Design a protein with these regions (language model features):
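Active-site-adjacent structural elements in enzyme catalytic cores
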Residues: 1-423
């Protein structure tokens, strides 16, 4: 009989804060535990669940919420694949709390480490760890990791999150945690506790909004396999990484080609609605005409209703230049709802656009002009529009050569989109 477990939120938001200077995770935990606080009890419960059960635990990192499991136990890791409905050939990233834990993974027989982290990674670790950077390492013979973590690849991805709470949970659990984003596979990644499907801890919102950058320093030249919170131009300033190559494609890998890292093979980050992405610089009048034609002809609907969009809903997600609702209607905003994300508040304007004898409801969201604000609000916006049951989402893209997070944002959007438009 299948075990049934109710989703619960364990309140640990007070602990989701930067670590004080010159203070270790261990010292912080000993003080917190000695006070017998509700947050300490929640962390102990979560750690015990991770160590002894096959139930995944959602927890906040600085990027997105992760769905964590003990990376050393097959049953525990299988719980992630089951909860996310994730393909088994899509590898997982391992999260650690220290370099010492990485060394334990590289030297499964114990004793003094004989295998060290490759020197090529030292400049990156010095600059970006803890942080939103995942490195690929060789998986040793007799690996401590469950085989499901690597998807039978000879390497594994590992990172040390900058979120002090994430490292605290790993420290208390005393296990490396396999932790993909805590969402059903292919759906937008979660950036607040409310987005997480399984058992989770409410540590508040996440700061970056897109997942970690994945790099491979085992090849020559080294490569960025997935864009994320650390920009490729930042990486190129590190010794040995000046000629780092782009090793990813914004579309999913096809056929039986094995992914080198998480996030490469399958379509990701997709809401239920059809997503139409307009590349940066698209002519505004042409964009509005395209949307109008979809509304009249039903082209924006996944059902392709020949009678148009009478009574239907669409989302418009703006970044740098689009006016509200693409100026499709002079009607005043009927209603404004708020979606909170990372301490910011996203305004969702609800506007009625007349179409002959009927009308279409437009849900308009402005993410801001900076890559940082767009990254923080992107996944929350897609989820909010999903909750409104829109039929199609039209998104204003940004230039992916603007550095830092811009490439990561466009990578996620191209993976989500069914249609790319340049007009």
């Amino acid at each position: 009989m299948t075990e049934q477990r109710q989703t619960r939120i364990l309140p640990v938001q007070r602990l989701n804060k930067p670590l004080e200077p010159n203070r270790s995770i261990a010292e912080w935990w000993e003080e917190e535990k000695s006070k017998n606080t509700p947050e300490a009890a929640a962390v102990l419960e979560a750690a015990e669940t991770l160590r002894t059960s096959d139930i995944p635990v959602g927890f906040p990192t600085e990027t997105v919420y992760g769905l964590g499991a003990d990376a050393t136990r097959s049953g525990s890791v299988q719980g992630i694949y089951k909860a996310k409905q994730r393909p088994s050939d899509n590898p997982l990233i391992v999260h650690v709390d220290s370099i010492e834990m990485v060394n334990r993974l590289l030297n499964p027989n114990g004793g003094s480490p004989t295998t060290k982290i490759p020197a090529i990674y030292e400049p990156l670790i010095s600059r970006f760890w803890p942080g939103a950077l995942t490195i690929l390492l060789p998986n040793p013979k007799g690996s401590l990791l469950a085989k499901e973590v690597t998807a039978n690849l000879p390497t594994f991805g590992v990172r040390m999150p900058s979120s002090a709470f994430a490292r605290l949970l790993i420290h208390v659990t005393d296990r490396p945690l396999a932790a993909p984003s805590a969402n059903a596979s292919t759906k937008p990644s979660p950036t607040t506790a409310e987005h997480v499907y399984h058992d989770l801890q409410n540590g508040g919102p996440c700061g970056v909004g897109v997942e970690s950058t994945v790099v491979d320093g085992l090849t020559n030249p080294p490569a960025v396999l997935r864009p994320g919170g650390i920009g490729i131009e930042e990486i190129r300033t590190c010794p040995g990484w000046e000629n780092v190559q782009v090793g990813y494609n914004d579309s999913a890998l096809q056929g039986k080609e094995a992914p080198r890292s998480p996030g490469m093979k399958y379509r990701h980050y997709s809401p239920k609605a059809r997503v139409v992405l307009f590349e940066a610089g698209s002519d505004l009048a042409s964009v509005a005409d395209r949307v109008k034609k979809d509304l009249i002809g039903g082209g924006g609907s996944s059902n392709g209703n020949a009678n148009g969009f009478s009574g239907r809903k669409i989302g418009i997600v703006r970044t740098k230049t689009w006016p509200i609702a693409l100026s499709l209607s002079d009607a005043e905003t009927k209603q404004t709802t708020q979606a909170s994300n990372d301490g910011d508040t996203l305004s969702i304007h609800q506007i009625s656009v007349p179409l002959g004898d009927s009308s279409t409801t437009v849900y308009d969201v402005h993410l801001g002009a900076s890559a940082e604000s767009i990254a923080r609000g992107l996944f929350a916006t897609l989820r909010s529009l999903d909750a409104e049951n829109v039929d199609a989402i039209y998104i204003e893209g940004i230039r992916d050569d603007e550095g830092d997070l811009a490439a990561a944002v466009m990578n996620r959007l191209r993976k989500a989109a069914e249609v790319f438009v340049v007009v």
